[in-house]
């Protein structure tokens, strides 16, 4: 069964960030679902969603998008069996202090923190590549392409 990434946003204002992640997941051939739920405002709704996804017999992980006070990432990570990747949206408010709510988690709660949407999708792909050859091949091709671009850019400077 093909892996699934559940992109869980704290609110609809995070849709642009979610779409960037989804676009990158497509390049790796990874199926995804985009959902909305707030750990602060709709905790029961989030639990219901997580139970639904956890019942699926397929590889899955969660990418959470929540700004301001990011309780969502820790909440999800504490509930699910697999990996959670926190990818909070950028914020200029309060000199970017929102990020601190994604950095410190209680013991036993360990969402990975990745700030760039493309890199959050790449981490998901790399996790799934451990047991999915198609995704592993996509990741390898992606990494080789990035490396080749650097080499080409360097060769232009050597002239």
Curated annotation (Swiss-Prot):
GO molecular function terms listed in the Swiss-Prot or TrEMBL record: phosphoribosylaminoimidazole carboxylase activity
EC number(s) given by UniProt: 4.1.1.21
Amino acids binding substrate: 11, 14, 38, 41, 67, 69
Catalytic activity, reaction form: 5-amino-1-(5-phospho-D-ribosyl)imidazole-4-carboxylate + H(+) = 5-amino-1-(5-phospho-beta-D-ribosyl)imidazole + CO2
Pfam families per UniProt: AIRC
Function: Catalyzes the reversible conversion of 5-aminoimidazole ribonucleotide (AIR) and CO(2) to 4-carboxy-5-aminoimidazole ribonucleotide (CAIR). Does not accept N5-carboxyaminoimidazole ribonucleotide (N5-CAIR) as a substrate.
Protein's name according to its UniProt entry: Phosphoribosylaminoimidazole carboxylase
Protein species of origin: Treponema denticola (strain ATCC 35405 / DSM 14222 / CIP 103919 / JCM 8153 / KCTC 15104)
């Amino acid at each position: 069964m093909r892996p699934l990434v559940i992109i869980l946003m704290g609110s609809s204002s995070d849709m642009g960030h979610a779409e960037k992640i989804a676009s990158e997941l497509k390049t790796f051939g990874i199926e995804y679902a985009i959902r909305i739920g707030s750990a602060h405002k709709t905790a029961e709704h989030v639990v219901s969603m997580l139970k639904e996804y956890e019942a699926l017999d397929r590889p899955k992980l969660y990418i959470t998008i929540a700004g301001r006070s990011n309780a969502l990432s820790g909440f999800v990570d504490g509930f699910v069996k697999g990996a959670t990747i926190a990818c909070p949206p950028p914020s200029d408010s309060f000199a970017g202090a929102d990020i601190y709510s994604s950095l410190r988690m209680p013991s036993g709660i360990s969402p990975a923190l990745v700030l760039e949407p493309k890199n959050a999708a790449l981490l998901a792909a790399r996790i799934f590549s451990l047991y999915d050859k198609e995704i592993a091949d996509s990741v390898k091709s992606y990494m080789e392409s990035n490396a080749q671009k650097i080499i080409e850019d360097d060769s232009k400077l050597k002239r």
